[in-house]
């Protein structure tokens, strides 16, 4: 009865109160040290921590992780975690063999890069010191390192002054001041030219070539029209046509030049006939409208060959009209074929639509009229819901 009276405590209760007081005091000290930034070791007393068993109600002492680690009798080690002296647990990183090899390779590569950078810096220092005058080297030795490092980047290269300049005229080339270029010379010899290059060169020479002066005045070539001795060299050399320049300008319907396209379209000549130079001589010039070379023919030679082929200008006109009619017929036939195909597709689509709607192919359409709409006083308008046809009815 005396133990339950206020103010009278047992020894066991006094011990518990004293232990709680000490524990609170230690917590307060740890908090102050933590706020001050000092390291706080684990200070849980071994003797003060007690547990009570349910069966007997007695108290048994317990130990924390730091007490177990600090104890001499227990050895704690793990492959995956590290336990510090203060009882904190850190996860240990486990590296594979491949990761270790990669780390070692990166370390060796970094060492090699550092060595190369040092060698380059040493070479730069050697080159700069060798190019500097002796007086500058002596003066720079007395200057502080900070000044030398700051002015090193902006120091201009040394100027080597000499009394004369040496030139090797054997290796010197005239560049024309950079404004003029030498004419392109053919580095290939005559034997190394292709056959097509040789033919093109010969054609160019034929265009420029002029007729030699006459030796025999009686047998000199004269113009076919006016018997003049001033024969055009181009027509005489390339087409074997004797005509002076005055007659060429006066008679363009006879001596003008025609292109290959005009010969095909106007005179209905074929490609093999135009390619045969024995039948129709020609000259070639650069085409201003494309990359292929332009072929030119004399008009009266083309007309003579066309009259011989078709039998005269009237027969040529008939052949041209016949080809134009055939061209129109082919165009109309193509149009009708396309129209027939379109009708077939439309009919097939109509059959497909009827089958999809569940109607037979031979079924007659019956209009499903909508309600009438009044247009004016005596006229109404109706519309089929299925096909969309509209009718107007007059109401009398």
Swiss-Prot record:
It comes from the Eukaryota. Residues 20-29, 118-127 have a biased composition (Basic and acidic residues). Keywords: DNA damage, DNA repair, DNA-binding, Metal-binding, Nucleus, Zinc, Zinc-finger. GO terms for cellular component: nucleotide-excision repair factor 1 complex. Residues 41-62 have a biased composition (Low complexity). One of its GO terms (molecular function) is damaged DNA binding. Zn(2+) binds at residues 223, 226, 244, 247. Pfam families: XPA_C, XPA_N. InterPro entries: DNA-bd_dom_put_sf, XPA/RAD14, XPA_C, XPA_sf, Znf_XPA_CS. Belongs to the XPA family. This is DNA repair protein RAD14. It comes from Candida albicans (strain SC5314 / ATCC MYA-2876).
């Amino acid at each position: 009865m005396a133990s339950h009276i206020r103010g009278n405590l047992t020894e066991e209760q006094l011990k518990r109160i004293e232990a709680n007081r000490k524990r609170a005091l230690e917590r307060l000290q740890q908090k102050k040290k933590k706020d001050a930034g000092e390291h706080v070791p684990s200070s849980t007393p071994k003797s003060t921590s007690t547990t009570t068993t349910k069966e007997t109600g007695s108290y048994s002492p317990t130990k924390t992780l730091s007490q177990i680690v600090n104890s001499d009798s227990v050895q704690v080690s793990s492959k995956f975690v590290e336990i510090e002296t203060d009882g904190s647990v850190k996860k240990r990183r486990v590296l594979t063999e491949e990761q270790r090899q990669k780390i070692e390779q990166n370390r060796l590569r970094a060492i090699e890069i550092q060595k190369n950078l040092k060698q380059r810096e040493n070479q730069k220092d050697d080159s700069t010191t060798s190019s500097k005058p002796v007086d500058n080297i002596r003066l720079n030795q007395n200057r502080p390192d900070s000044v030398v490092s700051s002015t090193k980047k902006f120091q201009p290269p040394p100027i080597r002054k000499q009394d004369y300049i040496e030139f090797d005229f054997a290796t010197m080339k005239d560049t024309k001041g950079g404004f003029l270029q030498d004419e392109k010379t053919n580095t290939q010899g005559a034997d190394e030219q292709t056959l097509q290059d040789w033919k093109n060169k010969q054609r160019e020479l034929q265009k420029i070539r002029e007729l030699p002066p006459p030796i025999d005045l009686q047998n000199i070539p004269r113009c076919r029209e006016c018997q003049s001795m001033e024969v055009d060299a181009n027509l005489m050399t390339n087409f074997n046509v004797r005509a002076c320049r005055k007659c060429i300008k006066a008679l363009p319907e006879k001596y003008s030049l025609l292109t290959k396209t005009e010969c095909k379209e106007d005179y209905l000549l074929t490609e093999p006939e135009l390619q045969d130079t024995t039948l129709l001589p020609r000259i070639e010039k650069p085409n201003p409208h494309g990359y292929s070379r332009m072929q030119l023919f004399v008009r009266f030679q083309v007309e003579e060959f066309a009259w011989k082929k078709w039998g005269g200008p009237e027969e040529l006109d008939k052949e041209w009209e016949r080809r134009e009619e055939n061209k129109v017929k082919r165009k109309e036939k193509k149009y009708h074929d396309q129209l027939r195909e379109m009708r077939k597709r439309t009919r097939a689509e109509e059959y497909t639509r009827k089958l999809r709607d569940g109607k037979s192919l031979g079924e007659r359409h019956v209009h499903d009229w909508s309600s009438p709409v009044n247009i004016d006083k005596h006229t109404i308008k109706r519309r089929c819901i299925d096909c969309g046809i509209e009718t107007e009815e007059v109401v009398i």
